Amino acid sequence: GRDLCPSCATRRMVDVSAHMVDQVLPRVQHRQWVLSMPKRVRWHLRHKPEVISGLLTVFLRAVETTIRQRSPGAPPDAHFGAVAFVYRFGSYLNSHVHFHVLVTDGVFSAGPDGEAIFHPALDLERKDFEAVQAKLRHRGLRWLHRHGFERLARYCARRPAAGRRCWCGSTNASRSGARSAA
């Protein structure tokens, strides 16, 4: 396939990045979040697309709730922007489904004339990341249980599978004045 050639994969990555910056992403601060799941969950992610969409939705809602709470002046119906990339392999081409998500570092609300108003989030603190992890763990286990994966949910609820599997990059200033993920 096209992604087995390093030159082709690099060119495609550069093209997608340029398109995202030029055409899709608003000129606001962004942060990259990476989510990896316990190994037992990865098999289900690989073979059952509904698990990918379900757990990614749970993750995005947990992040959005935390960012909204950290955005002063944001109304309760404000939303963030996010672009998720599902990676299916690790760096050694091992099967390893995980998510890289680019998220606005704040939320948007509708102004009086319908224009989008950006409410930047305050700097996230360790407790904010821990809150996302706690929400993800609780809601993710509940999602698995509700969708017929009770045994898997019980396995994931015990240590060490219940450990930290979420990473969030810091924000840095970019050439355009917007902040991007590190």
Residue ranges of each PLM-predicted region?
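Beta->alpha loop/short-helix hinge microenvironment recognizer with preference
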Residues: 1-182
